[in-house]
Every structure is written in C-alpha cells, then in structure tokens.
Swiss-Prot record:
The gene is RPS1B. It is found in: Cytoplasm. This is Small ribosomal subunit protein eS1B. It holds the Pfam family Ribosomal_S3Ae. Keywords: Acetylation, Cytoplasm, Ribonucleoprotein, Ribosomal protein. One of its GO terms (biological process) is translation.
C-alpha cells in the first residue's frame, strides 16, 4: 500500500507572523549635559541598548559626539550660525557629562560672507592649550574700504595679505596657548579673538567679518575625571551655566 499525504488532515499555516517586539523597550534614554561654560546645560537626550551580560551601556556612550547649535546652548539667535561639537566623556547615572570637541560655521553663513570687490584672508594654526589639548584653529577675514576711499573695490596686495595672515596666526597662537580649553570656549562664544585680530590689523589693512570659523580637536590629554567634574560644577544639579559676557577678560589671580 502506498503511503502518501492525507489531504483531509488540516495543514499548519505557513509563515506565521512572529510577535513583533518594539526595539525601544530594550533601550534606555540618557540626558546629555553641556559644560557649565554654556548658559543652557540641557543639550538633549540619546538612547542605547540596556546593559546585558558583559555589555555595558556606558562603554557604548563614552566617546559619542553630538553637534548642537550655539544658539540653543546660549539661548540667543545671534549665535545660530555656529555649531558646537560636544564629546561624551563620563556617564553618571542617567546623565552624560560632555566636553568641548570642536566648533564650525554653517555653510549658509560662510557663503553669505563671500562677496565681490573684496579680498578673502584665511589662516590656520595648530596650537596646544595650557592643559595639553592640541587644536587646529581656522580664521577667516575680509578686507573693507579704507577711510575716505572712493574706489569701489577693496582688493589688497599679496604683500599686505601675507602681513595680515602672519598677524592672524600670531594672535591665534598667543590667545590659545595661554588658556585652558574651558577658557578658550569662553573666548570663542563672544568672539574675542576675532575682534582682537580686527583691531590689531588696522595698521596693515582694515578688515571686516573676522571670525574663528572652525576649531578642530586633534589630540587630547589623558582623561581626568576631577577636571571634568569641575567643568560641570562638580556634579551640581543646576541646569543653567554662567553667561559669558561680550567683554570677556582673563581672570588674573592677585595671590595664590
């Protein structure tokens, strides 16, 4: 007798849909905290898979880089064309403590600065801060009309541009090498270095729209938890940092 399939038997349904599990149920949300250099310390939230077995969520969070508009950090639309990069260095509970990782301009702002009838001056320098962070700083500037000038164009001679560029590099090296990374951030917010360059180059050739357009972190020293906690107000729960005034001045200690 031949043995075959019994068509009367009910068949099991093929391709049964598996129970869909929402992937977000396996993830945790963490709050990103900016250093107290910025006025608004609440940057936003990020998520990661929960710690399971040998996999620790903190290891996956450390080193993450987030890009935030400086307008959000300072609560002012005047800074909307600048972007700040923050790097997660430490995890404390549900809070991620970050440090400054870089600065950049938005592309639309850079394009709006470039115009006809003027010369563009760019300079960059690699310099080490007093707390051993190696940075590459990029500056941009444009020539402007001299006093009582009738001529429409403001082009500068190559020799003048070389002098201006040399002065820009000299100022950037001086302003960055004598301060810590936190102090440099306080200088970048009100654009102290740009104003110093504009003031110092008046005798060579008048400039306008002088900006530090980019700061790139090349190398950082060994991680120091104490320094990071001090940068964040030693783990304080305050959600607001100290506002940086436009007339920023270095603090000089009279006595130690």
């Amino acid at each position: 007798m031949a043995v075959g399939k019994n068509k009367r038997l009910s068949k099991g349904k093929k391709g049964l849909k598996k129970k869909v599990v929402d992937p977000f149920t396996r993830k945790d949300w963490f709050d990103i905290k900016a250093p107290s250099t910025f006025e608004n310390r609440n940057v936003g939230k990020t998520l990661i898979n929960r710690s399971t077995g040998l996999k620790n969520a903190a290891d996956g969070l450390k080193g993450r880089v987030v890009e935030v508009s400086l307008a959000d950090l300072q609560g002012s639309e005047d800074h909307s064309y600048r972007k700040i990069k923050l790097r997660v260095d430490e995890v404390q509970g549900k809070n991620l403590l970050t440090n400054f990782h870089g600065l950049d301009f938005t592309s639309d702002k850079l394009r709006s600065l470039v115009r006809k009838w003027q010369s563009l001056v760019e300079a960059n320098v690699t310099v080490k801060t007093s707390d051993d962070y190696v940075l590459r700083v990029f500056a941009i500037a444009f020539t402007k009309r001299q006093a009582n000038q009738i001529k429409k164009t403001t082009y500068a001679q190559s020799s003048k541009l070389r002098e201006v560029r040399k002065k820009m590099i000299e100022i950037m090296q001086r302003e960055v090498s004598n301060v810590t990374l936190a102090q440099l951030t306080s200088k970048l917010i009100p654009e102290v270095i740009g104003r110093e360059i504009e003031k110092s180059t008046q005798t060579i050739f008048p400039l306008q729209n002088v900006h530090i357009r980019k700061v790139k972190l090349l190398k950082q020293p060994k991680f120091d938890l104490g320094a990071l906690l001090a940068l964040h107000g030693e783990g304080s729960t305050e959600e607001k940092g100290k506002k940086v005034n436009a007339g920023f001045k270095d603090v000089v200690l009279e006595s130690v």
